Amino acid sequence: MTDTFQDEAQIRSILDDGAKALYTKDADAMVAHYADDIVVANLAPPLRNKASEGRNKGVLEQWFDTWSGPINLELRDVHIEISGNLAFAYGVSRMSGTKRNGERPDIWTRVTHCFRKERGEWKIAHLHDSVPFYMDGSYRAATDLKP
């Protein structure tokens, strides 16, 4: 197996670990593959988080507490590009589950992970989730789209 195949397998494993951590609502596991200086631009405000906020397990735990059961994450159409000690993976993800208030979110988002190899291990240096907006003047988030 070449280094590129090994690197891609490691990155896919990290993505799988993230989905498992989300499902079990394990904040420690969620941040285990984060670089110390990670920048997170997820769906919740603000526009982006500082590195110290991106690794904040307390914020994750508060969000996990808004769900009554597991949080499902499906990654689809994942493409990975690797060059030296940098890599990125992008695709679409589906998040679903049941909130404590009875809501049952089931939304697809666009997702990009940027990785940096540090001391022989791939770490997530940047994480970005987004949804498109309808450009009909309403600027509503298009959370009803499906691949």
Enumerate the predicted regions with their spans.
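Amphipathic alpha-helical repeat scaffolds
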Residues: 12, 16-20
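Short beta-strand edge/turn micro-motifs at domain boundaries
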Residues: 108-138
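Generic short beta-strand segments
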Residues: 91-98
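Short helix-adjacent coil turns
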Residues: 18, 25-26
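A solvent-exposed, acidic/Ser-Thr-rich amphipathic alpha-helical stretch
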Residues: 5-8, 13, 27-83, 92, ...
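Basic/polar N-terminal segments that are highly enriched at the extreme N-terminus
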Residues: 1-9, 145-147
